[in-house]
């Protein structure tokens, strides 16, 4: 199958280079899927929302190109609540029961939770097998499927147990966005906005101009947003694959956002808790407000960010019932911290993020208290 003219590809350079392909119809392209399976075993990991739409088609596409494949399947409950060590254990068991050898491949068919679990299982099985990311949510296409960060949550915090394991390929089939709930689309757009906020003022302006098209799931607008976001992440990941420096900038809003998610208990789909993208949206506003309080930026840029997020129908305030002290306690467990001191991604205005070490907790607590 040749790619349509609307397709785009982004190369991720580094010690383990790979390509992000963005196009409609990729999940039906058996030859393209199967070329990434070096051996005879493949595990297809998906969730209860995505699998009914796409799992059978992906399996059929793989077998049409590689009838010799032995394909195992694991379907987990949808939502962040499944990103646990127990579910990770289920993935490892599935690989064992499949008889997967070191040339096996794990296909991650779903959003960020599926991608994290599949990637972590692939990283650990026999000390590392291939993983192909098949993101079906906008958030996964522009963020979690790219870069090789894999992890699960524990009660004490989000993404505290994991590994760096770059995928063999990322195949982002934009047709899957047709079945994406509106709330999940908006969650992904929060991560898209982040790229404009941290390093691309022109992209920030473009997002404002195209906000109605993006919210209406216009294919051309979404393809452009995905490609530009992936280009930004690919550039950063290539220079800093293990997050020793610049890559931390991709976490604007995440320290605050992860604290909110953890304190709310990683709610299941359909409840009132914030999802990841929504929590990041709130976190970005909090980071911008803290930056202004510290004299790093101005109130106008903070308001521009808040207004853009609001225009995309995203939350910008901490949900009620979350004590500031409890959120601060969660933030103390963030992986970016050093020697027990808060280390946050803040900004000097639109397009100019930076990592700030040793942020005073009193200033953070004041922002959390509103």
UniProtKB/Swiss-Prot annotation:
Enzyme class name: lyase
EC number: 4.2.3.4
Catalysed reaction equations from the record: 7-phospho-2-dehydro-3-deoxy-D-arabino-heptonate = 3-dehydroquinate + phosphate
Reported cofactor(s): Co(2+); Zn(2+); NAD(+)
Subcellular location: Cytoplasm
One record GO biological process: chorismate biosynthetic process
Comment on bound cofactor: Binds 1 divalent metal cation per subunit. Can use either Co(2+) or Zn(2+).
Main location: cytoplasm
Pfam families: DHQ_synthase (PF01761), DHQS_C (PF24621)
GO cellular component, one term: cytoplasm
GO MF: 3-dehydroquinate synthase activity; metal ion binding; nucleotide binding
Pathway where it operates: Metabolic intermediate biosynthesis; chorismate biosynthesis; chorismate from D-erythrose 4-phosphate and phosphoenolpyruvate: step 2/7
Binding site for Zn(2+): 191, 254, 276
Keyword terms, alphabetized: Amino-acid biosynthesis, Aromatic amino acid biosynthesis, Cobalt, Cytoplasm, Lyase, Metal-binding, NAD, Nucleotide-binding, Zinc
InterPro entries membership: Dehydroquinate_synthase (IPR050071), DHQ_synth_AroB (IPR016037), DHQ_synth_fam (IPR030963), DHQS/DOIS_N (IPR030960), DHQS_C (IPR056179)
Binding residues for NAD(+): 112-116, 136-137, 149, 158, 176-179
Family per record: Belongs to the sugar phosphate cyclases superfamily. Dehydroquinate synthase family.
Function per UniProt: Catalyzes the conversion of 3-deoxy-D-arabino-heptulosonate 7-phosphate (DAHP) to dehydroquinate (DHQ).
Protein name: 3-dehydroquinate synthase
Organism: Xanthomonas oryzae pv. oryzae (strain MAFF 311018)
